[in-house]
Protein backbone atom coordinates (compact mmCIF):
# COMPACT_ATOMS: atom_id res chain seq x y z
CA UNK A 1 0.00 0.00 0.00
CA UNK A 2 2.96 2.32 0.49
CA UNK A 3 3.72 2.13 -3.23
CA UNK A 4 0.14 3.02 -4.07
CA UNK A 5 0.15 6.04 -1.75
CA UNK A 6 3.38 7.16 -3.41
CA UNK A 7 1.80 6.68 -6.82
CA UNK A 8 -0.89 9.23 -6.04
CA UNK A 9 1.66 11.91 -5.17
CA UNK A 10 3.20 14.24 -7.73
CA UNK A 11 6.62 12.68 -7.15
CA UNK A 12 5.78 9.21 -8.46
CA UNK A 13 3.64 9.81 -11.54
CA UNK A 14 5.37 6.98 -13.40
CA UNK A 15 4.02 4.15 -11.24
CA UNK A 16 1.76 2.00 -13.37
CA UNK A 17 1.48 -1.51 -11.91
CA UNK A 18 1.32 -3.29 -8.55
CA UNK A 19 1.77 -7.04 -8.22
CA UNK A 20 0.87 -8.03 -4.66
CA UNK A 21 0.86 -11.72 -3.78
CA UNK A 22 -0.69 -11.26 -0.32
CA UNK A 23 -4.15 -10.13 -1.42
CA UNK A 24 -6.48 -8.82 -4.09
CA UNK A 25 -7.14 -5.24 -5.19
CA UNK A 26 -10.12 -4.81 -2.82
CA UNK A 27 -7.98 -5.70 0.19
CA UNK A 28 -5.17 -3.43 -1.02
CA UNK A 29 -7.55 -0.50 -1.47
CA UNK A 30 -9.01 -1.06 1.99
CA UNK A 31 -5.57 -1.24 3.64
CA UNK A 32 -4.52 1.85 1.73
CA UNK A 33 -7.52 3.86 2.87
CA UNK A 34 -7.51 2.62 6.49
CA UNK A 35 -3.84 2.41 7.50
CA UNK A 36 -3.20 1.44 11.14
CA UNK A 37 0.07 3.39 11.24
CA UNK A 38 -0.63 6.47 9.11
CA UNK A 39 -4.35 6.79 9.74
CA UNK A 40 -7.14 7.25 7.24
CA UNK A 41 -6.00 8.41 3.83
CA UNK A 42 -8.10 11.20 2.41
CA UNK A 43 -7.85 10.26 -1.28
CA UNK A 44 -10.57 8.95 -3.56
CA UNK A 45 -9.90 5.24 -4.11
CA UNK A 46 -11.86 3.06 -6.50
CA UNK A 47 -11.39 -0.60 -7.44
CA UNK A 48 -12.17 -2.07 -10.84
CA UNK A 49 -11.38 -5.67 -11.84
CA UNK A 50 -7.60 -5.50 -12.18
CA UNK A 51 -7.11 -1.83 -11.33
CA UNK A 52 -6.92 0.48 -8.37
CA UNK A 53 -7.81 4.05 -9.24
CA UNK A 54 -6.47 6.75 -6.91
CA UNK A 55 -7.63 10.29 -7.66
CA UNK A 56 -8.15 9.27 -11.32
CA UNK A 57 -4.64 7.72 -11.55
CA UNK A 58 -5.02 4.13 -12.75
CA UNK A 59 -2.74 1.40 -11.44
CA UNK A 60 -2.87 -2.10 -12.90
CA UNK A 61 -3.18 -4.63 -10.07
CA UNK A 62 -2.26 -8.31 -10.25
CA UNK A 63 -1.48 -11.09 -7.76
CA UNK A 64 0.92 -13.41 -9.58
CA UNK A 65 3.19 -15.47 -7.30
CA UNK A 66 5.75 -15.80 -10.10
CA UNK A 67 6.84 -12.34 -11.20
CA UNK A 68 7.79 -13.72 -14.62
CA UNK A 69 4.06 -14.27 -15.27
CA UNK A 70 3.12 -10.63 -14.60
CA UNK A 71 2.19 -8.71 -17.78
CA UNK A 72 4.63 -5.87 -16.98
CA UNK A 73 4.84 -4.82 -20.64
CA UNK A 74 1.12 -3.90 -20.72
CA UNK A 75 1.83 -1.26 -18.08
CA UNK A 76 5.14 -0.13 -19.66
CA UNK A 77 7.07 -1.07 -16.51
CA UNK A 78 10.84 -0.61 -16.70
CA UNK A 79 11.70 -0.14 -13.00
CA UNK A 80 10.64 -2.70 -10.38
CA UNK A 81 10.35 -2.23 -6.63
CA UNK A 82 11.00 -5.77 -5.36
CA UNK A 83 9.43 -5.80 -1.89
CA UNK A 84 8.41 -9.42 -1.38
CA UNK A 85 11.49 -10.31 0.67
CA UNK A 86 11.54 -13.60 -1.25
CA UNK A 87 13.65 -12.54 -4.23
CA UNK A 88 16.93 -11.44 -2.73
CA UNK A 89 19.47 -13.76 -4.32
CA UNK A 90 21.06 -13.38 -7.77
CA UNK A 91 19.28 -16.43 -9.25
CA UNK A 92 15.93 -14.84 -8.34
CA UNK A 93 16.85 -11.27 -9.36
CA UNK A 94 18.73 -11.79 -12.64
CA UNK A 95 15.57 -12.85 -14.55
CA UNK A 96 14.21 -9.32 -14.06
CA UNK A 97 16.98 -8.20 -16.40
CA UNK A 98 17.63 -11.30 -18.53
CA UNK A 99 14.02 -12.39 -19.15
CA UNK A 100 12.01 -9.21 -18.61
CA UNK A 101 14.46 -6.54 -19.78
CA UNK A 102 13.98 -4.23 -16.80
CA UNK A 103 16.15 -1.10 -16.64
CA UNK A 104 16.38 -1.06 -12.84
CA UNK A 105 15.33 -3.14 -9.85
CA UNK A 106 15.16 -1.58 -6.39
CA UNK A 107 15.13 -4.23 -3.67
CA UNK A 108 13.70 -3.57 -0.20
CA UNK A 109 16.20 -5.81 1.60
CA UNK A 110 19.95 -6.49 1.47
CA UNK A 111 21.29 -8.40 -1.53
CA UNK A 112 24.60 -10.27 -1.88
CA UNK A 113 26.19 -11.48 -5.10
CA UNK A 114 26.45 -10.59 -8.77
CA UNK A 115 23.23 -9.26 -10.30
CA UNK A 116 22.99 -7.88 -13.86
CA UNK A 117 26.76 -8.28 -14.22
CA UNK A 118 27.74 -6.24 -11.15
CA UNK A 119 28.27 -6.92 -7.46
CA UNK A 120 25.12 -5.87 -5.60
CA UNK A 121 25.40 -2.40 -4.10
CA UNK A 122 23.76 -2.02 -0.70
CA UNK A 123 23.51 1.73 -0.21
CA UNK A 124 23.32 3.49 3.13
CA UNK A 125 22.62 7.13 2.32
CA UNK A 126 25.13 9.41 3.95
CA UNK A 127 27.69 6.60 4.12
CA UNK A 128 28.37 5.07 0.70
CA UNK A 129 25.90 6.52 -1.82
CA UNK A 130 28.85 7.95 -3.77
CA UNK A 131 29.64 4.38 -4.90
CA UNK A 132 26.43 4.27 -6.96
CA UNK A 133 27.12 4.50 -10.68
CA UNK A 134 23.88 4.54 -12.72
CA UNK A 135 25.75 3.40 -15.83
CA UNK A 136 26.64 0.07 -14.20
CA UNK A 137 24.40 -0.53 -11.16
CA UNK A 138 21.06 -1.79 -12.43
CA UNK A 139 20.11 -3.21 -9.05
CA UNK A 140 19.99 -0.97 -5.99
CA UNK A 141 19.14 -1.77 -2.39
CA UNK A 142 19.11 0.37 0.72
CA UNK A 143 20.70 -2.42 2.79
CA UNK A 144 18.80 -3.37 5.96
CA UNK A 145 17.02 -1.30 8.57
CA UNK A 146 19.59 -2.35 11.18
CA UNK A 147 22.47 -1.37 8.88
CA UNK A 148 20.86 2.01 8.22
CA UNK A 149 20.55 2.64 11.96
CA UNK A 150 24.02 1.42 12.83
CA UNK A 151 26.23 2.63 9.95
CA UNK A 152 25.99 6.40 10.62
CA UNK A 153 26.88 5.92 14.30
CA UNK A 154 29.76 3.56 13.49
CA UNK A 155 31.05 5.98 10.84
CA UNK A 156 31.18 8.91 13.28
CA UNK A 157 32.76 6.86 16.08
CA UNK A 158 35.31 5.29 13.72
CA UNK A 159 36.29 8.62 12.15
CA UNK A 160 36.74 10.27 15.55
CA UNK A 161 38.07 7.45 17.74
CA UNK A 162 39.00 4.52 15.43
CA UNK A 163 37.16 1.24 16.02
CA UNK A 164 39.42 -1.83 16.23
CA UNK A 165 36.61 -4.39 16.58
CA UNK A 166 33.09 -4.37 17.92
CA UNK A 167 29.83 -6.17 18.48
CA UNK A 168 26.26 -4.95 18.44
CA UNK A 169 22.97 -6.07 19.84
CA UNK A 170 19.81 -4.99 18.12
CA UNK A 171 16.27 -4.96 19.42
CA UNK A 172 14.04 -5.08 16.39
CA UNK A 173 10.42 -4.06 16.06
CA UNK A 174 7.89 -6.75 15.13
CA UNK A 175 7.82 -7.58 11.41
CA UNK A 176 5.23 -9.25 9.16
CA UNK A 177 7.12 -12.55 9.34
CA UNK A 178 6.64 -12.83 13.10
CA UNK A 179 3.58 -14.10 14.92
CA UNK A 180 1.96 -12.33 17.90
CA UNK A 181 1.41 -15.66 19.70
CA UNK A 182 3.10 -19.06 19.34
CA UNK A 183 2.25 -20.77 16.03
CA UNK A 184 3.56 -23.63 13.88
CA UNK A 185 6.37 -22.50 11.56
CA UNK A 186 9.33 -24.26 9.94
CA UNK A 187 11.66 -21.77 11.67
CA UNK A 188 11.09 -22.70 15.31
CA UNK A 189 12.67 -19.49 16.59
CA UNK A 190 10.12 -17.46 14.61
CA UNK A 191 7.31 -19.78 15.77
CA UNK A 192 7.47 -18.15 19.20
CA UNK A 193 5.25 -15.14 19.86
List the predicted regions and their residue ranges.
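Single conserved hydrophobic/aromatic residue that forms the stacking wall/gate
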Residues: 1-8, 12
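Active-site-lining helix/loop region of Rossmann-like oxidoreductase modules
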Residues: 13-14, 46-47, 135, 151-193
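Glycine-rich beta-alpha junction loops
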Residues: 21-24, 111-112, 144-146, 170-177
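A structured beta-alpha segment of the ubiquitous adenosine-cofactor-binding alpha/beta core
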Residues: 38-91, 134
